[in-house]
Structures are given as C-alpha cells and as structure tokens.
Amino acid sequence: MKSLVAFLVVLSILRIQSQAKEVFNIFVPGNNGGNVQETVTIDNQENTATINIHSGSCSSTTIFDYKHGYIASRVLSRRACYIIKMDHKAIPALDKLQRFLYEKQTMNAMASTEYTWVKYNPLKSLITKVDWFLFGSPIEQLCKHIPLYEGEVATKPREVGTGGCAKVGILGILGISICGGIHL
C-alpha cells in the first residue's frame, strides 16, 4: 500500500512538472521563400512565454513576462534589447496565447489582421539605470549585458517609419512590430 501511495505521489509530481512548460515548434513562410522556425515556450509556473525565432540575421528572442507585466525583445543581429510595459488589452492572456499556439500548430491557418506597433527612439529611450527586480529574472537574463531601450505603443502606424520595423512570425501574427522612431 505504501508503494502505491509513493508511486501516485511521484506520478502526480511528474504530471505537474510536465504541465509547467509547454513547447511549440511552428514553421511559417519567410520572406525569401523558405521557412522560418519559431520555438515558443510557455512556462505556467513563471507565467512567461518565450519566443525564439530562428531566421539567420533576423533571429530574435522575445519574452512575455505576465507576472511582472513587461515584454522584452532582443534582435540578435543588433546589440540591443527593447522593453515595453505590457498592455493587457492588446496582448492575449497566457492561456489564450497557449490555446492560439496549439491551434496554430495543429491547424496552421490562424492569422490576425490587427497590429500593435511599438516604437522607440534610440537617442532618447536608452535605459541606463536598470531595476532588474521590476522587470523580473527572465528579462534580466535576456537583456542584462546589452543596451536596453524603452518602447511605447504607437497609436497609428504613421507614427513609425515602417521601413525600420522588425515583425516576424508569432510576433507578426500577434501584430507586434518593433520600429525605430527616427524620421529624417
């Protein structure tokens, strides 16, 4: 009887741990005719979603930290990290994102026509004194040793020069673009 109880306890612990993280691999068409691989990790214990886009010089990592309320994105070809306060009206809840990814992976036909444009000004928005406790450890691990810029939601796409925007895969599907806010 003790063995059965011990077995059930171990089984329930493993089941809880297996539900803590869920990984989705998605392939979307790239601009050059090939496919772009995206790996999305949903961590229900940390309340985060980490999106890795594997696309050569356009590769990026984005963390949605629902516990602290921030989104950080690092385009790997640039030595910079971009951070924005999460707008819970514009960004789906973690469980909805998880459901969307499941449907995207299984149906491979979901898309959004709404876009959230994020702009930053590299001359004005550099964050020099960073309170990592505010942003949380997942974002700290992503952005600690590179310049960090504060982004803001642009209410109209005309506020940003769309030629300098990064929008790939899941970020594009969720309607998020990162754009430089400099107009010459």
Curated annotation (Swiss-Prot):
- Look up the domain of life of the source: Eukaryota
The cross-references to SMART domains, in alphabetical order and at most eight, read: BRICHOS
Assigned GO CC terms: basal part of cell; extracellular space
Disulfide-bonded cysteine pairs: these are 81-143
Instruction: State whether keyword Nucleus applies.
Output: no
Q: Where does the record say this protein resides? A: Secreted
Where does the signal peptide begin and end?
1-20
Example GO biological process: response to stress
Keywords recorded for this protein, A-Z: Disulfide bond, Secreted, Signal
- BRICHOS domain residues: 54-151
How would you summarize the oligomeric state and partners of this protein? Answer: Heterodimer with TFF1; disulfide linked. Interacts with TFF2.
* Stated name of the protein: Gastrokine-2
What is the species of this protein?
A: Rattus norvegicus (Rat)
